[in-house]
Amino acid sequence: MIFQYDGTYEGFLCTVFEIYAMHLANDAQIHPADGCLTLEESRTVENQSGKADRVSQRLKQLGIASCIYDAWLSRKPDIENDLFAVIRLAIETGCSPMQARQRTCVRNVAAAAHLVRCETHRFLQFTRFVKVEREPEKPGLQVPGETKPGLYLADIEPAYDILLRIAPHFVRRFQDQCFIIRDQPRGQALVYDAHHWQIVSFPELMALPLPRDSQIESL
Protein backbone atom coordinates (compact mmCIF):
# COMPACT_ATOMS: atom_id res chain seq x y z
CA MET A 1 0.00 0.00 0.00
CA ILE A 2 1.15 3.54 -0.73
CA PHE A 3 0.88 6.00 2.15
CA GLN A 4 0.70 9.67 1.20
CA TYR A 5 1.54 12.47 3.63
CA ASP A 6 1.38 16.26 3.62
CA GLY A 7 5.06 16.87 2.85
CA THR A 8 6.03 17.95 6.38
CA TYR A 9 8.40 16.10 8.67
CA GLU A 10 5.62 15.72 11.23
CA GLY A 11 3.47 14.21 8.50
CA PHE A 12 6.22 11.73 7.66
CA LEU A 13 6.45 10.67 11.31
CA CYS A 14 2.66 10.26 11.46
CA THR A 15 2.87 8.03 8.40
CA VAL A 16 5.43 5.80 10.11
CA PHE A 17 3.05 5.56 13.07
CA GLU A 18 0.10 4.62 10.85
CA ILE A 19 2.06 1.96 8.99
CA TYR A 20 2.99 0.20 12.21
CA ALA A 21 -0.49 0.66 13.66
CA MET A 22 -1.90 -1.12 10.59
CA HIS A 23 0.81 -3.83 10.68
CA LEU A 24 1.91 -3.03 7.13
CA ALA A 25 5.61 -2.40 7.68
CA ASN A 26 6.58 -5.10 5.18
CA ASP A 27 4.42 -3.79 2.33
CA ALA A 28 4.29 -0.01 2.70
CA GLN A 29 5.65 2.79 0.55
CA ILE A 30 5.68 6.45 1.56
CA HIS A 31 5.32 9.41 -0.80
CA PRO A 32 4.40 13.09 -0.41
CA ALA A 33 0.81 13.65 -1.51
CA ASP A 34 1.87 16.56 -3.73
CA GLY A 35 2.70 15.13 -7.13
CA CYS A 36 2.02 11.50 -6.21
CA LEU A 37 -0.12 9.85 -8.89
CA THR A 38 -0.73 6.14 -8.55
CA LEU A 39 -3.16 3.44 -9.57
CA GLU A 40 -2.16 1.34 -6.58
CA GLU A 41 -4.11 1.23 -3.35
CA SER A 42 -3.26 4.34 -1.35
CA ARG A 43 -4.06 6.00 1.95
CA THR A 44 -3.68 9.67 2.88
CA VAL A 45 -2.37 10.16 6.41
CA GLU A 46 -3.59 13.05 8.54
CA ASN A 47 -1.04 15.03 10.52
CA GLN A 48 -1.51 14.49 14.27
CA SER A 49 1.07 15.90 16.64
CA GLY A 50 0.59 13.18 19.25
CA LYS A 51 1.51 10.43 16.81
CA ALA A 52 4.46 12.38 15.44
CA ASP A 53 5.77 12.99 18.97
CA ARG A 54 5.61 9.29 19.82
CA VAL A 55 7.60 8.33 16.74
CA SER A 56 10.07 11.16 17.33
CA GLN A 57 10.73 9.96 20.88
CA ARG A 58 11.24 6.40 19.65
CA LEU A 59 13.76 7.56 17.03
CA LYS A 60 15.67 9.40 19.76
CA GLN A 61 15.75 6.24 21.87
CA LEU A 62 17.13 4.33 18.88
CA GLY A 63 19.80 6.97 18.27
CA ILE A 64 18.74 7.86 14.73
CA ALA A 65 16.51 10.92 15.15
CA SER A 66 19.07 13.47 13.96
CA CYS A 67 20.18 11.42 10.96
CA ILE A 68 16.60 10.71 9.87
CA TYR A 69 15.64 14.38 10.12
CA ASP A 70 18.68 15.67 8.26
CA ALA A 71 18.28 13.11 5.48
CA TRP A 72 14.59 13.97 5.15
CA LEU A 73 15.53 17.63 4.63
CA SER A 74 17.43 16.64 1.50
CA ARG A 75 14.03 16.04 -0.18
CA LYS A 76 15.72 13.59 -2.52
CA PRO A 77 13.35 11.51 -4.67
CA ASP A 78 12.15 8.43 -2.77
CA ILE A 79 14.15 9.38 0.33
CA GLU A 80 11.09 8.56 2.47
CA ASN A 81 11.36 4.88 1.64
CA ASP A 82 15.07 4.76 2.43
CA LEU A 83 14.28 6.48 5.72
CA PHE A 84 11.53 4.02 6.50
CA ALA A 85 13.81 1.08 5.69
CA VAL A 86 16.38 2.44 8.16
CA ILE A 87 13.68 2.95 10.80
CA ARG A 88 12.52 -0.65 10.29
CA LEU A 89 16.06 -1.91 10.78
CA ALA A 90 16.45 0.14 13.94
CA ILE A 91 13.18 -1.13 15.39
CA GLU A 92 14.01 -4.73 14.52
CA THR A 93 17.49 -4.60 16.07
CA GLY A 94 16.77 -2.16 18.88
CA CYS A 95 19.69 0.10 17.97
CA SER A 96 21.00 2.38 15.24
CA PRO A 97 21.84 0.56 11.99
CA MET A 98 23.89 3.45 10.59
CA GLN A 99 27.14 1.49 10.74
CA ALA A 100 25.71 -1.19 8.44
CA ARG A 101 26.93 0.55 5.29
CA GLN A 102 26.56 -2.64 3.24
CA ARG A 103 22.83 -1.85 3.14
CA THR A 104 21.74 0.48 0.34
CA CYS A 105 19.15 2.27 2.47
CA VAL A 106 21.74 3.05 5.15
CA ARG A 107 24.22 4.38 2.60
CA ASN A 108 21.55 6.55 0.96
CA VAL A 109 20.34 8.00 4.25
CA ALA A 110 23.87 8.63 5.53
CA ALA A 111 24.85 10.35 2.28
CA ALA A 112 21.74 12.55 2.26
CA ALA A 113 22.23 13.56 5.90
CA HIS A 114 25.88 14.39 5.23
CA LEU A 115 24.98 16.64 2.29
CA VAL A 116 22.41 18.54 4.35
CA ARG A 117 24.80 18.99 7.26
CA CYS A 118 27.58 20.26 5.01
CA GLU A 119 25.24 22.74 3.34
CA THR A 120 23.87 23.86 6.69
CA HIS A 121 27.40 24.56 7.93
CA ARG A 122 28.22 26.50 4.76
CA PHE A 123 25.19 28.79 5.05
CA LEU A 124 25.78 29.32 8.76
CA GLN A 125 29.16 30.75 7.82
CA PHE A 126 28.42 32.68 4.65
CA THR A 127 24.85 34.01 4.86
CA ARG A 128 25.06 37.80 4.40
CA PHE A 129 22.40 40.18 5.73
CA VAL A 130 21.65 43.67 4.44
CA LYS A 131 19.55 46.34 6.10
CA VAL A 132 16.20 47.24 4.54
CA GLU A 133 15.54 50.98 4.81
CA ARG A 134 11.81 50.58 5.21
CA GLU A 135 10.24 47.68 7.05
CA PRO A 136 7.68 45.86 4.86
CA GLU A 137 4.26 45.32 6.37
CA LYS A 138 3.64 41.66 5.68
CA PRO A 139 1.36 39.13 7.36
CA GLY A 140 3.23 37.11 9.95
CA LEU A 141 5.97 39.72 10.40
CA GLN A 142 5.49 41.85 13.49
CA VAL A 143 8.36 44.24 14.09
CA PRO A 144 8.35 45.92 17.53
CA GLY A 145 9.40 49.24 15.96
CA GLU A 146 10.89 51.71 18.41
CA THR A 147 12.58 49.20 20.69
CA LYS A 148 13.96 46.97 17.91
CA PRO A 149 14.39 49.25 14.86
CA GLY A 150 15.54 48.02 11.49
CA LEU A 151 15.04 44.91 9.46
CA TYR A 152 17.79 42.77 7.99
CA LEU A 153 17.31 40.63 4.93
CA ALA A 154 19.30 37.78 3.40
CA ASP A 155 18.68 35.75 0.25
CA ILE A 156 20.00 32.21 -0.01
CA GLU A 157 19.75 29.54 -2.69
CA PRO A 158 20.48 26.25 -0.94
CA ALA A 159 20.27 22.92 -2.71
CA TYR A 160 18.44 21.47 0.29
CA ASP A 161 15.62 22.55 2.58
CA ILE A 162 17.76 23.94 5.42
CA LEU A 163 15.80 26.89 6.84
CA LEU A 164 14.66 24.84 9.83
CA ARG A 165 18.24 23.75 10.47
CA ILE A 166 19.76 27.23 10.40
CA ALA A 167 16.95 29.04 12.25
CA PRO A 168 18.09 28.35 15.85
CA HIS A 169 21.63 29.55 15.12
CA PHE A 170 20.63 32.91 13.67
CA VAL A 171 17.95 33.50 16.31
CA ARG A 172 20.55 32.99 19.04
CA ARG A 173 23.15 35.08 17.24
CA PHE A 174 20.87 38.02 16.42
CA GLN A 175 18.27 37.68 19.15
CA ASP A 176 17.71 41.45 19.43
CA GLN A 177 17.41 42.05 15.66
CA CYS A 178 14.51 41.55 13.27
CA PHE A 179 15.53 39.59 10.20
CA ILE A 180 14.30 37.58 7.24
CA ILE A 181 16.19 34.81 5.45
CA ARG A 182 14.59 33.98 2.11
CA ASP A 183 15.03 30.59 0.49
CA GLN A 184 14.48 31.71 -3.08
CA PRO A 185 14.33 28.29 -4.82
CA ARG A 186 11.55 27.12 -2.48
CA GLY A 187 9.65 30.40 -2.17
CA GLN A 188 9.72 30.42 1.62
CA ALA A 189 11.33 32.53 4.29
CA LEU A 190 12.49 32.39 7.88
CA VAL A 191 11.01 35.44 9.64
CA TYR A 192 12.16 36.58 13.10
CA ASP A 193 10.62 39.58 14.87
CA ALA A 194 13.08 39.70 17.81
CA HIS A 195 10.72 37.49 19.82
CA HIS A 196 9.51 34.56 17.72
CA TRP A 197 10.42 32.95 14.42
CA GLN A 198 8.42 31.08 11.81
CA ILE A 199 8.68 29.77 8.27
CA VAL A 200 6.29 31.57 5.90
CA SER A 201 5.46 31.54 2.20
CA PHE A 202 4.15 34.93 1.08
CA PRO A 203 4.72 35.84 -2.60
CA GLU A 204 4.90 39.56 -1.75
CA LEU A 205 7.58 38.94 0.83
CA MET A 206 9.62 36.84 -1.58
CA ALA A 207 9.36 39.55 -4.26
CA LEU A 208 10.77 42.32 -2.04
CA PRO A 209 14.01 43.44 -3.77
CA LEU A 210 17.27 43.61 -1.89
CA PRO A 211 18.57 47.16 -1.33
CA ARG A 212 20.91 48.67 -3.90
CA ASP A 213 24.59 48.62 -3.02
CA SER A 214 24.45 52.26 -1.90
CA GLN A 215 21.75 51.37 0.64
CA ILE A 216 23.45 48.33 2.11
CA GLU A 217 24.40 48.19 5.75
CA SER A 218 25.76 44.76 6.62
CA LEU A 219 24.76 43.04 9.83
Regions found by a protein language model. Give the residues of each.
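N-terminal ordered "arm"
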Residues: M1-K51
